[in-house]
Amino acid sequence: MGRAARTNWLHETIPVVPVPQRVSLTTSDGLTLLARHWDAGLRDVGCVVAHGFTGSSGNAPVRAICAGLSARGFGVLAPDLRGHGQSQGRCTAGADEPLDIAAAAAWLREHGYAQVAVLGWSMGGSAVLRYAGLGGAADAVVAVSSPGTWFERGTRPMRLVHWLCETRSGRASARLLRGTRIAPGGWAQVPEAPEEVVGAIAPTPLLIVHGDSDRYFPARHVDALAAQAPAADIWIEPGMGHAETATTPDLLDRIGAWLAAATSRSALPQPAVCDDEARD
C-alpha cells in the first residue's frame, strides 16, 4: 500500500472529532483517576468507555473507539482505570474497578448528560457488568470480550495474565513494559463473577459482544453470561479476536446504532403499575 493510499485509508476510518479534554475523577475509595472527555456538543447520551487490562484511555485502539462514538453524537468519557495510565492506585483485575466506572458515570451526570451508558472491553467489560449488576445506575450496558467467570487458565494468554498478577516478577514486568501497577497479594475475598450478577442488570438494555476467535476467553464465557441474562442481546462475531484491537469500524457502527436505539427505549416513560385496590 502506497503512502497516499495509507493516508486516504486513515482519513476514511478515523473520524475528525475534537481533541479530548483531560479531567480528573475521584473514586469513593479516594483515588484520583485521569480521564479523557470527548465532547460531542450534545448532552443527550454520555458513554463511559472502560479499557482492558494493561490499557489506558491514551492507547490508540481505545482512542479510536472513543473518537468513533463521539463522531456518532455521543459524549464519551474514558478513564484510566486504577493502576493504569496516569491514574492512582493498583489494578485489582476487576474487583474494585466498578468503583472507577461509578466515578465516571457520576461525572457525566454531574456535567449534564441526560442518560449514561457504560461500555467496557475485556477487564473493562467485567467492570461494567459488575457495576450495573451490583446496582450501579446506567441507561444501557455494553460488554465486549468480557470474561463470564474468573480464573481462566485454559488459554495461553490468560496463563500469562495470571503470571503477571500473581508473581512478583510478573508484576514488575507489567509495570516496566506496560506501566501497569498491579496490587500484590491477590484478592482477599473473591468478588462476584460477572455471570453471578449479570442477570440483575435487566430491565436495563444490555449488549454482550464476543468474538468466536477470542484467544483469551473462549465461548464458554459468553455462554455463561447469556445463560444468566436471557433478556440481553448477544452478538457472536465471526472471526473476531479479543477486545479493543479486534473492534472494527463496522462493529463500532453497529454498537453505536444499538446504543441509539437502547437509550431511546430507556428514555420512554414506563407504563404505570396498576393498583387493583385503588381501582376497586
For each feature predicted by the language model, list its residue ranges:
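Hydrolase active-site cap/lid region
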Residues: L134-W187, T204
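Conserved alpha/beta-hydrolase "acid-adjacent" motif
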Residues: R215-H221
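Short beta-strand/loop motif that positions the catalytic acidic residue
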Residues: I201-A202, I208-H210
